[in-house]
Every structure is written in C-alpha cells, then in structure tokens.
C-alpha cells in the first residue's frame, strides 16, 4: 500500500522539480553575459522568458531561479563554452 504512494510522490516530485543555474545560448554551452552594475535589468526578463521565476547578474553571467527541467543550464553538457554553428 505504501509503495504505490511512495512511487507516485517520487514521480510527481521529478515532474515538477525546478532548478537554478546559469542559462546558456541555444546550441552551445555559453552563458549569457551581463553587467553586474545592472543586477536585475537584463537577467530577470531573460529568465522569465525561459519560464524561470526570476534572475540576476552573478559573476558577469545571468543566474536564473526556478527553471523548468527542460531548460539547459551551464554545466550539464560540460564546462567549456562551445558552439554548433
């Protein structure tokens, strides 16, 4: 009885899990750069466009919070910036 309930909870958590991280350009592993003097101005709208809650400039790159699992973030495909153009 408890096993099916535990399995259902695990599946629901996995489906609705959100993540934080540096968003990257499509078909690359390159972060969006930003101006740290304008902490929210560029990054927050960018992160919201990618269905995150908000974002801010951190170490000269856009850090987003509460991103869906299907949005790629820096580090998932390596630690170097590259392009498939």
UniProtKB/Swiss-Prot annotation:
SMART domains documented for this protein: Knot1
Domain LCN-type CS-alpha/beta intervals: 19-82
Record's subcellular location: Secreted
Major location (coarse): secreted
GO biological process: defense response
Xref: CDD domains: neurotoxins_LC_scorpion (cd23106)
One annotated GO molecular function: toxin activity
Family stated for the protein in its record: Belongs to the long (4 C-C) scorpion toxin superfamily. Sodium channel inhibitor family.
Domain notes: Has the structural arrangement of an alpha-helix connected to antiparallel beta-sheets by disulfide bonds (CS-alpha/beta).
Protein name in UniProt: Putative sodium channel toxin Ts34
Organism classification: Eukaryota, Metazoa, Ecdysozoa, Arthropoda, Chelicerata
